[in-house]
């Protein structure tokens, strides 16, 4: 397996690569939920982790489904980090439904995650 094949086999690589392409349009600050191993593949600032100012628990509802916060709260929180797009792991947030977020545009949707931006 060559280097490029290895990269492409990582579940976060494709999403972060696509986010890098969109950074000229949406800015350098990308919020990420559950893809912390992929921050190295993003060319700008990837925000979000288990701990810290943008910890995952601030972006989710504390329930068994671990749902992402409602869209208006999500937009407000993203703006507080000067971000207009977010990538969400489907492994960690399997119940995320973009149809509940009509103020967002889907930029990329894969079996591993979804990249969305504020319209």
Swiss-Prot record:
Protein name per the record: Uncharacterized protein SF2091.1/S2213
The species this protein was found in: Shigella flexneri
